[in-house]
A protein has these predicted regions:
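Short amphipathic alpha-helical coiled-coil/interface segments
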Residues: 121-125
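WW-domain-binding short linear motifs
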Residues: 3-8, 115, 120, 139, ...
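A short, highly charged, low-complexity intrinsically disordered segment
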Residues: 143-162
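C-terminal, low-complexity/hydrophilic appendages and adjacent surface loops
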Residues: 12-113, 156-161
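Short, solvent-exposed turn/loop segments enriched in Gly/Ser/Thr/Pro and often Arg
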Residues: 12-13, 132-148
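Short, solvent-exposed polar/charged micro-motifs at secondary-structure junctions
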Residues: 1-2, 15-21, 146-151
């Protein structure tokens, strides 16, 4: 027993996968561009390099997430030319977000259509985003309804951190 009924995984800006152990569903972004996304961090670094001076000049200090123990974080706007792998994957997206039945197709070679399972997994993905305090812009990026108005941007852009 894994102790969970589902899990999500993905790359910044690219497809996000949700699985319940039987099915996998890859949700692709509504658009390839990530100009509306931001990096939220306490350690301003990409996986393989620090943020550039240009990136940091545009950073703002924003309100904490649920999991940062009241500590505000930097929001660094996404720049198109940073080479994030997720956006390259999004550019190669299939016509539809693929759904795979791991029981019949463990190698995930043949996508299937099952509207009921897809709707359930989309709902599960939404619940994970809510549970992990994802910013509203992330919901919009994946075509999901944010729990708060997008203009609030998770109440971070308009809230001044003292």
């Amino acid at each position: 027993d894994t102790g969970r009924d589902s899990a999500i995984l993905g790359m910044f800006g690219g497809p996000v996968c949700v699985t319940d152990g039987r099915w996998t569903y890859y949700r692709y972004p509504e658009r390839e561009s990530g100009e509306h996304l931001g990096f939220y961090t306490l350690a301003p670094s990409h996986i393989d390099r620090p943020f550039t001076t240009e990136e940091l000049r545009a950073a703002t200090l924003v309100a904490p997430f649920d999991f940062t123990d009241g500590v505000p974080v930097l929001r660094v706007p996404h720049l198109d030319d940073i080479g994030e792998a997720g956006f390259a994957a999004a550019a190669r997206r299939p016509r539809n977000s693929p759904l795979h039945d791991l029981l019949d197709d463990p190698r995930q070679e043949h996508a299937v259509e099952n509207a009921e399972v897809e709707a359930r997994l989309v709902s599960t993905l939404h619940a994970h985003f809510v549970r992990h305090d994802a910013p509203s812009e992330m919901f919009v990026h994946y075509g999901l309804t944010p729990p708060r108005p997008v203009s609030d941007n998770h109440e971070r852009q308009q809230e001044k951190v003292q």
